[in-house]
C-alpha cells in the first residue's frame, strides 16, 4: 500500500515538473533557446526586418554588418520615401492612388523588372508609411514631387533631420533599446563580414559564415537568413562586368556597397535579374575643393522637386525638364552640356531654400552650394551670357501663365517676378553619378530568393530585401522608392519567416 502511494506521488511529481518546465520554456526563456534569424546588413531593409521580427513576433535576431556603423546607404537618403493615398497626402489635399503610383513605376521601368513586385511595392506603400509613423513616431508630414511622379508622394518630416538619417536613427534606436534590455532577443554585430551560407543536403539553411572584427572565421547557427546587404555601386569590378560604360563615373555609394550578397547567393544558385540596369543619378555635387574625388555627395532630387532648375554651365540657359526620370535628365546633361567635365549648374530661389532649409544649410556647410547674386554667378562660373539675359531666363521659367519650354509638369517656389541682377540665388555644380543598382537576386512576393532558371525558391530559409534584390524597379528607379522598397519587402520577409519559424 505504501509503495503504491509512493509510486503515485512520484508520477504526480514528474507530471507537475513537466508542466512547470513547459510553462517556463514557453516564455522568454524559450526565445533565448531558439536559433536566431540572421539579418545581413543594417540599412533600412535590415532594420525594418529586424524590428518587425522582434516587435511583432518576438523572434530573436542577430544583425550582422561588415561596416563599423549602422545605416548603410539608407542613412544618406535625402529626398524621402514614397507612399500613395497616405494620410499625409489627404491632409495636404493631394489626390493619389496606388494605381497611379504603379502606372508611374511601370513607365519608369521601361518594360524591365517584375510587374507583380512593382504592384506589391505600390499597393503596400500606404501601410509602409503608416507603419513608420505609428511604430516609430515619425511625422512624415511633408511632400515633394520628384521626377517621373504624377503627383507629390515623396514623404519627409518637418524638422532638422534628413529623411534617411531620421528613419534609420529611429529604427536603430528601438533595436538598441531592446538589445540593452534583452540581449537574447537582438544582437547587433558590426565589423562582421558574411562570406558564405551553410546548407544541409536538403538545401536548408544551417548557418551563416562570417569574419569577425579580428579576422576570425566564425559560424552563426541559424535556419533563416535575410540578405539586406545592398547593391554594388561602389564596386568597379562588378560595374566592369555588368555595366562597363559607367566605370568612369563617380559614385554616391559607400565603400561597403560591393555586391557581396549577390555574389554569395549567385554561388548558391540564385537567379540574378537586370544586373546591367544601373541607375545614374543626374545630380551629384562637385566639391570645388576636391573636384576629382570619385565619391560625391548626392544633390537630392528634392532640390529639383521643390523648384530647383538646371542651367547649361557655359550658356546659362535651361536645357531640360528637370522633373523627367533620372535616366532622361542624365542623358540630357551628358548630351547637351560640355563633355569635357560632364556638369551642369543647379540653381534655386530663396523659396526653395525656405522649404528645404536644413538640407541646404548642410550642403552650404560643405561648400557644395553657394548663395550668390546673379552678377556673381555670371563671374564665378564664367558664363557666356550677361546677368540681364540670365534674369530674363529665370523670369521666363517662373512665368506660370505660359507653357514651360521643356514641359516641366510642376513649377513651384519659382524666382520672384521682380528678380534683378543683384538678387541672390543658391547654386551648386552637379554631375551624373552611379547611384543605385536596379538589378540583383530575383525574389518573389514573399521576399524569398528564386533559384536560377526556375520559379522555385532557392531555400525556404533564404530571403532578400532592398537593393540586393532585383526586379522591383526595372530599368529605372523612381526617386523615393528605394526607402519604400526596404520597408515593404523587409516587413514581408519578417512576416513570412514568422510563418515558418
Curated annotation (Swiss-Prot):
Primary location recorded for the protein, binned into one broad class: mitochondrion
Cofactor: FAD
Top enzyme category: oxidoreductase
Cross-referenced Gene3D superfamilies: FAD/NAD(P)-binding domain (3.50.50.60), Succinate dehydrogenase/fumarate reductase flavoprotein, catalytic domain (3.90.700.10)
GO CC terms in record: cytoplasm; endoplasmic reticulum; mitochondrion
Coiled-coil intervals: none
E.C. designation(s): 1.3.1.6
Transit peptide: 1-32
MF (Gene Ontology): FMN binding; fumarate reductase (NADH) activity
Catalytic residues, chain numbering: 281, 304
Any Pfam family matching the protein: FAD_binding_2
Cofactor, free-text remark: Binds 1 FAD per monomer.
Note: Present with 432 molecules/cell in log phase SD medium.
Function (record text): Irreversibly catalyzes the reduction of fumarate to succinate. Together with the second isozyme of soluble fumarate reductase (FRD1), essential for anaerobic growth. Involved in maintaining redox balance during oxygen deficiency conditions. Reduction of fumarate is the main source of succinate during fermentation, and under anaerobic conditions, the formation of succinate is strictly required for the reoxidation of FADH(2).
UniProt name for this protein: Fumarate reductase 2
Organism: Saccharomyces cerevisiae (strain ATCC 204508 / S288c)
Amino acid at each position: 500500500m505504501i509503495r503504491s502511494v509512493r509510486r503515485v506521488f512520484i508520477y504526480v511529481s514528474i507530471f507537475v515538473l513537466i508542466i512547470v518546465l513547459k510553462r517556463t520554456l514557453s516564455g522568454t526563456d524559450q526565445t533565448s533557446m531558439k536559433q536566431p534569424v540572421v539579418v545581413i546588413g543594417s540599412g533600412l531593409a535590415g532594420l525594418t526586418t529586424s524590428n518587425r521580427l522582434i516587435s511583432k513576433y518576438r523572434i530573436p535576431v542577430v544583425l550582422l554588418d561588415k561596416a563599423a556603423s549602422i545605416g548603410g546607404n539608407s542613412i544618406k537618403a535625402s529626398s524621402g520615401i514614397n507612399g500613395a493615398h497616405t494620410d499625409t497626402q489627404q491632409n495636404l489635399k493631394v489626390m493619389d492612388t496606388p494605381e497611379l503610383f504603379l502606372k508611374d513605376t511601370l513607365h519608369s521601368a521601361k518594360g524591365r523588372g517584375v510587374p507583380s513586385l512593382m504592384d506589391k511595392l505600390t499597393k503596400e506603400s500606404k501601410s509602409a508609411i503608416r507603419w513608420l509613423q505609428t511604430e516609430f513616431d515619425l511625422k512624415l508630414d511633408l511632400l515633394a514631387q520628384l521626377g517621373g511622379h504624377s503627383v507629390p508622394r515623396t514623404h519627409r518630416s518637418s524638422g532638422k533631420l534628413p529623411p534617411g538619417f531620421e528613419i534609420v536613427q529611429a529604427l536603430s534606436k528601438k533595436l538598441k533599446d531592446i538589445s540593452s534590455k534583452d540581449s537574447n532577443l537582438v544582437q547587433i554585430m558590426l565589423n562582421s563580414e558574411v562570406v558564405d551560407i551553410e546548407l544541409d543536403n536538403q538545401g536548408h539553411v544551417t548557418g551563416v559564415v562570417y569574419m569577425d572584427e579580428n579576422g576570425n572565421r566564425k559560424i552563426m547557427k541559424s535556419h533563416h537568413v535575410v540578405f539586406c546587404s545592398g547593391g554594388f555601386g561602389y564596386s568597379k569590378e562588378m560595374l566592369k562586368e555588368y555595366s562597363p560604360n559607367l566605370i568612369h563615373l563617380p559614385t554616391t555609394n559607400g565603400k561597403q556597397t560591393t555586391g557581396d550578397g549577390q555574389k554569395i547567393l549567385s554561388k548558391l544558385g540564385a537567379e540574378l535579374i537586370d544586373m546591367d540596369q544601373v541607375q545614374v543619378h543626374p545630380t551629384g555635387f562637385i566639391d570645388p575643393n576636391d573636384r576629382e574625388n570619385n565619391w560625391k555627395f548626392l544633390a537630392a532630387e528634392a532640390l529639383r522637386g521643390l523648384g530647383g532648375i538646371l542651367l547649361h554651365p557655359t550658356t546659362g540657359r535651361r536645357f531640360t525638364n528637370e522633373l523627367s526620370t533620372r535616366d532622361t535628365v542624365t542623358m540630357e546633361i551628358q548630351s547637351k552640356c560640355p563633355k569635357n567635365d560632364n556638369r551642369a549648374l543647379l540653381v534655386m530661389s530663396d523659396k526653395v531654400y525656405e522649404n528645404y532649409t536644413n538640407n541646404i544649410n548642410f550642403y552650404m556647410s560643405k561648400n557644395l552650394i553657394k548663395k550668390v547674386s546673379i552678377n556673381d554667378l555670371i563671374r564665378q562660373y564664367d558664363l557666356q551670357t550677361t546677368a540681364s539675359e540670365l534674369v530674363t531666363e529665370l523670369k521666363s521659367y517662373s512665368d506660370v501663365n505660359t507653357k514651360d519650354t521643356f514641359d516641366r509638369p510642376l513649377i513651384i517656389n519659382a524666382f520672384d517676378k521682380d528678380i534683378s541682377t543683384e538678387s541672390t540665388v543658391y547654386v551648386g555644380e552637379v554631375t551624373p553619378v552611379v547611384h543605385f543598382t536596379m538589378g540583383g537576386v530575383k525574389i518573389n512576393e514573399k521576399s524569398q530568393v528564386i533559384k536560377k532558371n526556375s520559379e522555385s525558391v532557392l531555400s525556404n530559409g533564404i530571403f532578400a530585401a532592398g537593393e540586393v534584390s532585383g526586379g522591383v524597379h526595372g530599368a529605372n528607379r523612381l526617386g523615393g522608392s528605394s526607402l519604400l522598397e526596404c520597408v515593404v519587402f523587409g516587413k514581408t520577409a519578417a512576416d513570412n519567416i514568422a510563418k515558418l519559424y
